[in-house]
């Protein structure tokens, strides 16, 4: 358990503010700059590379993707069958929703009376219509055995639907009906549909020999390689797989994969060839180069496959295949995933782009392959492959070659043109050694005057952010990745000073104005920076310097809101927290109570009203007024009278309340609330240091320290000066809280490090203030309040350790 706490403390040193239960995206962990949608066959979209999902979706997974609507290819086949006389909505009802009763009425009476209005179409009374209806009646009879429609009734932990189990007599009876219908049907399209139902029925019923026989005797003789042919072939492939004829099954799945759009994913999911011998046999069974290419691409999707090797295999048999383009894009994105990883800002060995030795070797082989492909001139889409090569050069850090190759591309494809421009400009950015005004203007003209940021813009900011750090332009480096909230954890004075100069600069360039407006939403940017600088000094207890900067801030400045997710409304909502960033701070920050909880309201959290003895402490303060009050309290605390004792007590309360275990622990970290701040949990009594950063893409870090000794000293001084036993009792009890924090801060005594010896938490050795409280102040009213509300003290009195 002790190691867990140590890990938390170490993690806090590289803190970045995130939602506690936020979803982490691997697709979002790198800059994807190459558009996979450049491939010629868009039906392959599900097989674009994605790390977050099993299959790629254009609906929101990729900035370059356009939303696609699912097409029902079966309905399109029905539309052709009825010579486009019925629309897709009418056909959808006819095929999927019509009742057996209505269809039977039409078939037997040859009339449309007494049926659903949607079915009242004269075309259903034609010979084609009647044969279609008779087929649907048979299909609906087969449906329970072929689709998942029944709830599982076994005792396993499975709650999904299952297919109805089929007995041999049920199969024989249903197949006989299909045989008779097949023989009686004249239209070959409907005969093919009946044959498909019989192949599927046999396959799902476990009668694999019958499935293969039906395909050979009912499907093949029709000589119709339409969609239903491939639907039937897929069922035959499943039967072959069940018979452990893996090569034959793989070959059939590859043929269906190549010739259909809607069955690509199921065929990929069903494709199982685990050894080279079976794969070689499947290749020999292929009738066309494209079928061979489909086999290679199906194998290439597996994680164990080498994408470049499969590219070479596909190129050898079908150099113009879209599968080659697909495998090339997948391989390139894998290389981007390695090279363009968003850097860890605290990694001393970081470089960007980043490529390990194995990745570099693979990239150079890909470059050589693409150069050879272009030289041999076997492919028609020269513009695609030139664009691809230019991007490989970009990945390899050969920026001049990337720009030169991109400039040679001549294309009428707007997507190719957009990609080559993107690659060329990213190469230009990568080649920059310093960022000057001319470079900034060029960047502004290309990106920053656009309304929506792209992944490319993120890449550009990555390069800029690091170069700006090297140029010691900290403000611009910081704003490449952050708004002011990136400073809340560290209050980095160097960045704050540079930001004050930058934001206050006159005659800003277009680039500089855009950088500020994109990252800083505030209308009072300078005021917020002055507040940050003041708080930097306040956190160091340098009150005089803090006051200088707070005097530049409007007294009612407020910029923090509590942000939470409303699951009912599916939206984030903002509410007021206990701290708005600058103003409306309760005088309770100087107060105390025996037992305070983080989820208390301010009114619930504190009960002591000693602070009301000081007229200069307002009920509600801003930071300037708070610092002014503390300066006065510190002056008074140097005295020897009762007011001096009270001043020491209030100062102790302030330092305790703003410590990591106090109600206002959020105060110096700009959190609107004090709840769920696990990143603050730390026992270090001196501030941690932050390593030299590669960039600021995770903010400026987190600097924490917990100093209960300061509060303790003020409480002890208050007790020593005061002549009021009630105030003495309060001071001693508050000091006992500090004792516990000090106990935890010593080496092996962190929260889980005291060996689960809970008695240490209330023993005299750990809490000597408990003994002082018992010995000296047991007659006070506050002592009785402590007895009633503090369990630690109750245990101390009980065990007298």
PLM regions: where:
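Bacterial Sec-dependent signal peptides at the C-terminal "C-region" and cleavage site
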Residues: 13-21
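Extracytoplasmic/secretory-pathway proteins
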Residues: 20-200, 205-801
């Amino acid at each position: 358990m002790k190691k867990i706490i140590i890990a938390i403390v170490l993690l806090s040193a590289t803190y970045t503010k995130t939602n506690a239960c936020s979803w982490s995206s691997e697709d979002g962990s790198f800059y994807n700059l190459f558009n996979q949608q450049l491939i010629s066959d868009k039906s392959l979209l599900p097989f674009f590379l994605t790390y977050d999902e099993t299959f790629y979706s254009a609906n929101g997974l990729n900035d370059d993707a356009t939303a696609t609507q699912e097409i029902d290819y079966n309905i399109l086949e029905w539309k052709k069958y009825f010579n486009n006389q019925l629309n897709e909505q009418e056909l959808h009802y006819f095929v999927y929703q019509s009742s057996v009763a209505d269809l039977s009425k039409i078939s037997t009476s040859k009339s449309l009376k007494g049926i659903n209005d949607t079915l009242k179409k004269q075309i259903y009374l034609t010979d084609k219509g009647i044969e279609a209806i008779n087929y649907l009646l048979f299909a609906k009879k087969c449906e329970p055995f072929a689709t998942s429609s029944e709830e599982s009734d076994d005792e396993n932990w499975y709650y999904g639907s299952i297919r109805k189990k089929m007995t041999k007599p049920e199969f024989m009876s249903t197949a006989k009906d299909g045989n008779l219908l097949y023989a009686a049907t004249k239209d070959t399209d409907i005969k093919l549909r009946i044959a498909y139902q019989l192949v599927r029925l046999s396959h799902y019923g476990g009668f694999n020999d019958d499935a293969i026989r039906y395909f050979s005797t009912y499907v093949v003789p029709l000589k119709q390689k339409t969609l239903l042919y491939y639907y039937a072939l897929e069922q035959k492939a499943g039967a072959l797989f069940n018979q452990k004829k893996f090569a034959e099954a793989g070959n059939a799945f590859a043929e269906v994969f190549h010739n259909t759009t809607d069955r690509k994913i199921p065929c990929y999911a069903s494709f199982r060839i685990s050894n080279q011998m079976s794969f070689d046999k499947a290749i020999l069974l292929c009738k066309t180069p494209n079928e061979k290419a489909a086999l290679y691409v199906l194998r290439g999707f597996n994680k164990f496959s080498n994408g470049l090797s499969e590219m070479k295999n596909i190129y050898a048999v079908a150099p113009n295949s879209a599968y080659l383009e697909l495998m090339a894009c997948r391989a390139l994105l894998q290389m981007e995933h390695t090279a363009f990883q968003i850097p860890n800002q605290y990694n001393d060995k970081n470089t960007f782009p980043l490529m390990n030795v194995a990745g570099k070797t693979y990239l150079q082989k890909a470059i050589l392959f693409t150069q050879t492909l272009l030289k041999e001139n076997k492919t028609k889409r020269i513009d695609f492959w030139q664009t691809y090569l230019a991007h490989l050069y970009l990945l390899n850090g050969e920026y001049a070659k990337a720009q030169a190759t991109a400039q040679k591309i001549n294309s009428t494809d707007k997507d190719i043109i957009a990609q080559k421009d993107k690659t060329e400009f990213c190469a230009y950015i990568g080649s920059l050694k310093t960022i000057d005004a001319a470079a900034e203007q060029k960047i502004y003209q290309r990106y920053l005057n656009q309304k929506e940021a792209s992944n490319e813009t993120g890449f550009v900011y990555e390069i800029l952010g690091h170069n700006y750090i090297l140029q010691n332009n900290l403000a611009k480096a910081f704003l490449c990745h952050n708004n002011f909230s990136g400073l809340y954890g560290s209050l980095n004075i160097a960045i704050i000073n540079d930001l004050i100069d930058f934001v206050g600069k006159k005659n800003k360039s277009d680039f500089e104005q855009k950088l500020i407006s994109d990252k800083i939403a505030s209308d009072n940017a300078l005021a917020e920076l002055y507040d940050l600088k003041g708080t930097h000094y306040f956190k160091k207890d340098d009150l005089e310097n803090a006051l200088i900067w707070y005097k530049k801030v409007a007294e009612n400045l407020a910029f923090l809101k509590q942000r939470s997710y409303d699951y009912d409304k599916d939206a984030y909502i903002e509410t007021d927290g206990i701290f708005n960033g600058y103003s409306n701070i309760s005088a309770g920050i100087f107060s105390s109570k025996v037992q305070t909880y983080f989820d208390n309201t301010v009114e619930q959290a504190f009960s002591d009203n000693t602070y009301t003895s000081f007229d200069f402490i307002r009920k509600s303060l801003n930071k300037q007024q708070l610092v002014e009050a503390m300066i006065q309290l510190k002056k008074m605390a140097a005295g020897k009278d009762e007011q001096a004792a009270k001043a020491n007590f209030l100062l102790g309360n302030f330092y305790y309340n703003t410590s990591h275990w106090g109600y206002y622990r959020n105060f110096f970290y700009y959190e609107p609330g004090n709840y769920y701040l696990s990143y603050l949990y730390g026992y270090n009594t001196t501030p941690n240091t932050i390593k030299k950063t590669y960039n600021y893409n995770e903010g400026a870090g987190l600097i924490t320290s917990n100093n209960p000794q300061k509060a303790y000293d003020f409480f002890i001084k208050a007790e020593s000066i005061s002549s009021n036993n009630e105030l003495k009792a309060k001071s001693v009890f508050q000091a006992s809280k500090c004792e516990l924090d000090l106990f935890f801060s010593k080496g092996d005594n962190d929260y889980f490090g005291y060996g689960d010896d809970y008695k240490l938490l209330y023993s005299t050795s750990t809490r000597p203030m408990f003994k002082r409280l018992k010995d000296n102040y047991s007659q006070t009213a506050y002592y009785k309040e402590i007895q009633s509300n503090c369990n630690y003290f109750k245990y101390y009195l009980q065990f007298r350790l």
